[in-house]
Amino acid sequence: MSLIKWSIDPTHSEIAFKVKHLMISTVTGQFKKFSLVGETETDDFNTARKIEFTADIDSIDTNNEQRDAHLKSADFFNGERHPQITFSGTKYEDKEDGKLYGDLTIAGVTRPVTLNVEFGGIATDPYGQTKAGFTVAGKISRKEFGITYGAVTETGGVLLGDEIKINAEIQLVKQVVEEKAAA
């Protein structure tokens, strides 16, 4: 039996999120520094044994430095105490509608989440590297992770929505194939 190790290709991947602002428009942000490692027994990912993802809070970018600084503060992600968001996959199902189950930790709070996954396939690039592509999407409640900042407008409206939409375009690079002795 072999064990295949995969890591993220950061130049061909992006991790983005969206949240309602004033309930009339959407603010989009992304994380510029992130990593993902995975282990599978085959190239089809149905045998995924490990999926570990991290995003650095300090790399958040919403195209507004003042807002980014506020998001890093204790009002939101508390980046000083919790410098990373982590996701640890527990199960992957590549059926008609792919699902990735795992534990997401934001600001020190861990919750189980289910993400929708579209497997784009496997290809070899011009440099001989084997790559796998995925689109990952999901929704979470920021309040379930203890992010409850909620300024109110002068008319009593909500400044920020609770629902956060996650969208990631992931390209993984096959790193190592290790032969494991049968147990």
Predicted features by range, described:
Residues 1-183:
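Low-complexity, acidic/polar, glycine-enriched regions of mature
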